[in-house]
Regions:
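Conserved, helical-rich catalytic subdomain that frames metal- and/or nucleotide-binding sites
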Residues: 3, 8-103, 120-121, 127-131, ...
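Catalytic nucleophile-His microenvironment captured as a short glycine-rich beta-strand/loop
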Residues: 113
Length: 149
């Protein structure tokens, strides 16, 4: 929509442009399950205080173009709801990290997971390991692209 990195605020209706994301290999994996976004948000609303990611740290890391800090600041509060319902999401994250991902996180309400990698060779190793694990039905390697570099 904005042709670049952006922060979604509110319920996703407000977009704020951010510094360009560092170019890096990304592995995306989807397990053979479906997740009800409605159910995830209903359960999230019932939690007392879901854990929130370090947005200030993430914004600083983006500004500094530090991939390790960016990855370390990532977070998705919806994981606290979706992973207990579908543990395979956590298993996919574990395989990615055990095979070299700087970090891995569920995308949106799930079930897809993405991992950030320092190089293509490590991504390929993790892709093989995921394929062998049988946890994911679809596995794709790609690269972060941002034309505002």
């Amino acid at each position: 929509v904005m042709r670049g990195t952006a922060l979604a605020e509110g319920i996703g209706e407000k977009l704020r442009p951010l510094p360009a994301m560092v170019k890096c290999p990304v592995l995306v994996a989807k397990p053979p399950i479906s997740v009800s976004t409605k159910t995830v948000y209903e359960r999230l609303d019932s939690l007392e205080q879901p854990p929130h990611p370090d947005m200030d740290g993430l914004l600083e890391a983006l500004q500094a173009r530090d991939l390790n800090r960016i990855a370390g600041s990532m977070g998705n509060i919806l994981e606290s709801v979706t992973i207990p319902m579908h543990p395979v999401i956590s298993q996919i994250k574990d395989v990615m990290v055990e095979n070299g991902a700087i970090n891995a996180m569920m995308s949106g309400s799930g079930p897809s997971v993405f991992g950030l990698f320092a190089d293509e060779a490590t991504l390929k190793q993790a892709k093989r390991a995921l394929r062998e694990s049988g946890y994911a039905a679809q596995i794709y390697g790609t690269t972060i692209y941002n034309n505002r570099r």
